[in-house]
A protein has these predicted regions:
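Glycan-processing catalytic domains of CAZymes
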Residues: 1-249
Length: 249
């Protein structure tokens, strides 16, 4: 089973190779500075998600194509976002969207967002992942559960998002025991509402729980009314410096 592999951009100098996984900025026309920063040399990125219009959109978007190209040229892995709708999405729809991501934006893999977590849906997710790997050689697959799923999912993807939520929940979160059987580069944590003074604590939690790919931001979802991932964290330079130099370790 393939694990997280390095790109041309060095991800980190730490033993755990801690790096950033960007869940998806706003459209490049809305967030041009954010997309430009991701292509800056030396940024410790594991991957960045491209979400054109809740998926690949109905037609190619030249601005998204340009943004994705800049990231690839900088050695950053670009993932297309596919909404699994907690297992209710039709298999054919998912694969059709994936093919459009490949044809239009030459993505390196996929984030299956809102991925189900229970054992009963595991065969269908396995079927989807198998097809994604068939239509895109060496596809990097991230399953966006947002919580700890049935352990069987770990055998069907490169990485699992085992936490996605607020800082108030993250600071008291617990890790499932089965994750100790896998290296940290198999797990991702996405946390919003992390205050700047608590950034070091958040990095420490990720290290203790064994997650090498992270995304921490001080932006909040305002009670579910906004997307906290659409803009850059206020402490962007600090978190890049901490991860890039191994300070978090």
């Amino acid at each position: 089973m393939p694990h997280l592999t390095s790109t041309k951009t060095s991800t980190s100098s730490t033993e755990l190779r801690t790096g950033l996984g960007v869940p998806g900025y706003a459209h490049p026309l809305v967030a041009p500075a954010e997309w430009a920063e991701l292509a800056r040399p030396g940024t410790p990125l594991h991957w960045a998600v491209l979400d054109v219009a809740d998926g690949p959109g109905a037609r190619p978007d030249p601005h998204c194509l340009e943004a994705a190209g800049r990231l690839r040229n900088a050695g950053v892995r670009v993932l297309g976002r596919l909404d699994s709708a907690h297992g209710t999405r039709a298999y054919g729809e998912t694969i059709s969207e994936a093919q459009r991501y490949i044809d239009w934006y030459r993505v390196d893999g996929f984030l299956l967002d809102h991925c189900p977590t229970d054992r009963a849906t595991l065969p269908e997710v396995r079927r989807t992942v198998t097809t994604l790997r068939a239509i895109r050689d060496n596809a990097h697959i991230v399953l966006g559960h947002g919580t700890h799923p049935h352990p069987g999912y770990a055998e069907n993807a490169d990485q699992l998002v085992t936490f996605s939520g607020s800082w108030s929940d993250y600071r008291w979160s617990q890790v499932s025991e089965w994750t100790a059987d896998y290296p940290p580069d198999r797990f991702c944590h996405l946390v919003h509402g992390v205050p700047g003074p608590h950034l070091e604590e958040a990095l420490r939690i990720a290290r203790w729980q064994g997650a090498a790919t992270i995304w921490f931001t001080d932006r909040t979802d305002r009670g579910g009314r906004v997307d906290p991932w659409e803009t850059m964290p206020g402490y962007w330079d600090e978190i890049v410096s901490r991860i890039g130099t191994g300070v978090s370790e």
